[in-house]
């Protein structure tokens, strides 16, 4: 009755006006419906529609990655000790632990790529023009644990970026097939054209990245920087935050590069040979080419496109590459030394003032067991709340607040078999920040 009275007031009694009145009502109704309608498939964060809180909420609800267990991720990311303790206790309850997703699961779900991407909640459009205009390249080296790989890919995925995946030749066939099935669902993710068997601490780890470098440079995507990852890495910044950090480098690279200790100098004093493992020989190596000063770091880098091009094409770089092939863990001194070489784009001088620690570089955040301690007594970080493997912390929920205070783009190591709560909370945090631009 009230609606009828309202119509009469708006359109008083003349039949000639009836059509116009109903048209007016239709326009009002249409505008109201459009106000609450969002085309999530074609939305981006800078579109007019996205300024609506309603649309933003709809998008987040369609893409959110909430922790599957009853833990307080917002509290954990803010360092709330009660929330952390509850998460650590929850992680100890074996009956609550979910078995990891299998190769077979991914082989089945990827038969329908659209269903796979929707169900696993991949972001399938650029979230801003700034990100669209600044594509990032990834070299992803993996050998096991298919769910870890898929979750890492989902966390760093953006349709404007480009991803090269290198799978260890020694990996099980079902794992290789599952990786192929996943990447077949994305036009900007591909398998490296040349695969090698990767042996711990040997040259093959570098060769895997070099193979991806060659493929990525041949891609049609005009990427600006290359990041390399392994299966235990995870981003701690959104893609938008990474773009901002990379732009601030202004063409420079960012990677650990320090003076080697005496023990590390032994890594290139003798030749090493590879069978199933790496072992030293009694054959001494010649000094580095052109007496180039050697530096040490780690396997991870943030490298400009020009740096990558010079790694592959510059004759001086190629001489050094050949020289380090029979050293121990060459990935930990090749990149660090090239970063101080004067002919390399984006490098820094070899002077001590330019030494770069892993905490100063933005490439990777790692918590080493022998550096852990009481921060009030000068230790660089508190003890690991997870466990240690090869003296590296596999993070637990108690580490997440500290992790998020750092400027690095990615952190290492994560393993859902050790603590899935920290990974789930990090996923939830990153997805919320990507959509809303704010923390949990």
Curated annotation (Swiss-Prot):
A GO CC term attached to the entry: membrane
UniProt main location, coarse: host cell
Glycosylated residues in this chain: 72, 108
Cytoplasmic topological domain: 1-9
Transmembrane segment boundaries: 10-30
Membrane topology summary: Single-pass type II membrane protein
A GO biological-process term: protein glycosylation
InterPro entries assigned: Glyco_trans_14
Described function: Non-essential glycosyltransferase that can synthesize all known mucin beta 6 N-acetylglucosaminides. Mediates core 2 and core 4 O-glycan branching, 2 important steps in mucin-type biosynthesis. Has also I-branching enzyme activity by converting linear into branched poly-N-acetyllactosaminoglycans. Contributes to the post-translational modifications of structural proteins.
Miscellaneous field: Was acquired from an ancestor of the African buffalo around 1.5 million years ago.
PANTHER family: BETA-1,3-GALACTOSYL-O-GLYCOSYL-GLYCOPROTEIN BETA-1,6-N-ACETYLGLUCOSAMINYLTRANSFERASE 3, GLYCOSYLTRANSFERASE 14 FAMILY MEMBER
Family statement drawn from the similarity comment of this UniProt entry: Belongs to the glycosyltransferase 14 family.
Protein's UniProt name: Beta-1,3-galactosyl-O-glycosyl-glycoprotein beta-1,6-N-acetylglucosaminyltransferase
Species this chain originates from: Bovine herpesvirus 4 (strain LVR140)
């Amino acid at each position: 009755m009230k609606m009828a009275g309202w119509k009469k007031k708006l359109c008083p009694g003349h039949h000639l006006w009836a059509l116009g009145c109903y048209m007016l009502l239709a326009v009002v109704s249409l505008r109201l419906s459009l106000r609450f309608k969002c085309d999530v498939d074609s939305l981006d964060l800078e579109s007019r529609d996205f300024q609506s809180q309603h649309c933003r909420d709809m998008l987040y609800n369609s893409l959110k990655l909430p922790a599957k267990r009853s833990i307080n991720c917002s509290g954990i990311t803010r360092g709330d000790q009660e929330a952390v303790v509850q998460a650590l206790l929850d992680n100890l309850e074996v009956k609550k632990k979910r078995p990891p997703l299998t190769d077979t699961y991914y082989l089945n779900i990827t038969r329908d790529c659209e269903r796979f991407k929707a169900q696993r909640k991949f972001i399938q459009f650029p979230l801003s023009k700034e990100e669209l205009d600044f594509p990032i390249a990834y070299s992803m080296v993996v050998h096991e644990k298919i769910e870890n790989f898929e979750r890492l890919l989902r966390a760093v995925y953006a349709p404007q970026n480009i991803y090269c995946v290198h799978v260890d030749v020694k990996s099980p066939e079902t794992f290789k097939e599952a990786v192929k099935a996943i990447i077949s669902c994305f036009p900007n993710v591909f398998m490296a054209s040349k695969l090698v068997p990767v042996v711990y601490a040997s040259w093959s780890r570098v060769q895997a990245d070099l193979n991806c470098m060659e493929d990525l440079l041949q891609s049609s995507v005009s990427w600006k920087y290359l990041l390399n990852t392994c299966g235990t890495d995870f981003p701690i910044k959104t893609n938008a935050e990474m773009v901002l950090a990379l732009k601030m480098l202004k063409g420079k690279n960012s990677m650990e590069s320090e003076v080697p200790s005496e023990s590390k100098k032994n890594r290139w004093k003798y030749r090493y040979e590879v069978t199933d493992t790496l072992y030293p020989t009694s054959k001494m190596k010649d000094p580095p080419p052109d007496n180039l000063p050697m530096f040490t770091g780690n396997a991870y880098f943030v490298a400009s496109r020009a740096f990558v091009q010079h790694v592959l094409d510059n004759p001086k770089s190629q001489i050094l590459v050949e020289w380090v092939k029979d050293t121990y863990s060459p990935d930990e001194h090749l990149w660090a030394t090239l970063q101080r070489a004067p002919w390399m784009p984006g490098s820094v001088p070899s002077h001590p003032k330019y030494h770069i620690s892993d905490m100063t570089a933005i490439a990777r955040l790692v918590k080493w067991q022998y550096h852990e301690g009481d921060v009030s007594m000068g230790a660089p970080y508190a003890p690991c709340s997870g466990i240690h493997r090869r003296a590296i912390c596999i993070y637990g929920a108690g580490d997440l607040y500290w992790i998020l205070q750092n400027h690095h783009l990615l952190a290492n190591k994560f393993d859902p078999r050790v603590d899935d709560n920290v990974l789930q909370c990090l996923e939830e945090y990153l997805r919320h920040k990507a959509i809303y631009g704010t923390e949990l």
